[in-house]
Amino acid sequence: MATLTIDEIVEAIKNMSVLEVAELVKRLEEEFGVSAAAMVAAAPAAGAAAGAPAQAEEKTEFDVILKSPGKNKIQVIKVVREITGLGLKEAKELVDNAPKPIKEGVPKEEAEQIKKKLEEAGAEVELK
């Protein structure tokens, strides 16, 4: 088996489409039994411990987390597609693998609108 350098791997990833990168992330998660979403969510929590009072007052960006699609999964998939611009297959995988982040680092107003749309479709949503 040929050994690739990190630079070669980065170049290969730079030439991939967004959908191919999403599939790569999914395969890496399955192969190594990890979740990229958990790492992203855990990073702010570690920083928040150091300056918790200031962080709570200044929080302007939120992550919209789909906790559960509820009973009306098809409607939730449609809303996820509308919000993220994902294709049907990718949106279905995201909904099927809940809890997953739908959007990250969005302003409070936008996060609340997304949460409202998803909850109207029957999903259980959390803002972090």
UniProtKB/Swiss-Prot annotation:
GO terms for cellular component: cytosolic large ribosomal subunit. Homodimer. Part of the ribosomal stalk of the 50S ribosomal subunit. Forms a multimeric L10(L12)X complex, where L10 forms an elongated spine to which 2 to 4 L12 dimers bind in a sequential fashion. Binds GTP-bound translation factors. The keyword NAD does not apply. Transmembrane segments: none annotated. GO terms for biological process: translation. Keywords: Ribonucleoprotein, Ribosomal protein. Gene3D superfamilies: 3.30.1390.10, Single helix bin. It comes from Aquifex aeolicus (strain VF5). Forms part of the ribosomal stalk which helps the ribosome interact with GTP-bound translation factors. Is thus essential for accurate translation. SUPFAM superfamilies: ClpS-like, Ribosomal protein L7/12, oligomerisation (N-terminal) domain. GO terms for molecular function: mRNA binding; structural constituent of ribosome. The keyword Ribonucleoprotein applies. InterPro entries: Ribosomal_bL12, Ribosomal_bL12_C, Ribosomal_bL12_C/ClpS-like, Ribosomal_bL12_oligo, Ribosomal_bL12_oligo_N_sf. Belongs to the bacterial ribosomal protein bL12 family. This is Large ribosomal subunit protein bL12. Pfam families: Ribosomal_L12, Ribosomal_L12_N.
